[in-house]
Amino acid sequence: MSLDSPVSLADAVKGATAVLADAGVPSPAVDAQLLAAHLLGVGRGELAAMLFGSAAAPAGYDALVARRAAREPLQHITGVAYFRHLELSVGKGVFVPRPETESVVQLALDVLTRMSQEREGGLSAVDLGTGSGAIAASLATEAAGVRVHAVELSDDAFPWAQRNLAGTGATLVHGDMRDALHELDGTVDVVVSNPPYIPADAIPRDLEVRLHDPHMALYGGGADGMEMPTAAAATAARLLRPGGYFVMEHAEVQAAQMAALLEGSGAWENVRSHVDLTGRDRATSGWRR
């Protein structure tokens, strides 16, 4: 039965949940509800109340469910990704920000807070490989008075970053992180990066990632995926002042490699790994000598 036929919202969501579960979607009930809420223009709380009433299924619901069943990312269908306190615009050509990156942002924010208490004058932060602009937008809106700069190379991702950083005060540069922002060399307080880091022969497990995230945002270059992380670390070393802070996200299995990368360069001290909310090694940081 088509979910667009005259059935109740509750029955439509129940049917959509079954369709998505059969397709292997990891959170079928939540996604079914979010798709309905998106079409109805309501939040999940209001939708929950509507499910107990006599509301009809919204027109076009089955089409969106079919797209999600084909493993198109939920965020691409709704056009929205939630990150920390932000509602970001996302779609084809841009990496969908992940919840685990929120903890990386928090590390940078904590350092900026301490620096602001210890120093007079404005602070500066750089996001290398900003993608959707999630990290830069978080820094710009949560760290008062910090001058934020963001760099993105992808022609496809750059417009999404422009949209998400509009009105935040952040400065966005369209260019390669390896040679960007030379005018800031030796002056920046904090650098954050979530660079591409997947090894060349690794195949992402999730179909949403494998089929829809841009390869440019996934694969780090080289057999071990370390080319772009190495470049990010080198640029951070160039940009940061002595005593500046660098934090970079990576895969759980790359923690030792990232620590060795920073420790072996001679540019960093107090190198350490950080776990995310699931207890997995998610980031490595260091302080500029």
What are the residue ranges of the model-derived segments?
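Glycine-rich S-adenosyl-L-methionine
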Residues: 155-158, 208-241, 245, 251-253
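Conserved beta-strand segments of alpha/beta enzyme cores
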Residues: 87, 147, 169-171, 269-272
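Conserved SAM/SAH cofactor-binding pocket of Class I
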Residues: 100-206, 231
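Short, electropositive alpha-helical surface patch
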Residues: 247-265
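Core SAM-dependent methyltransferase catalytic element
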Residues: 260-289
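Short, flexible, mixed-charge acidic loops at enzyme active sites
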Residues: 80-81, 201-215
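Conserved AdoMet
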Residues: 29, 36-111
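Non-catalytic accessory regions of SAM-dependent methyltransferases
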Residues: 1-48
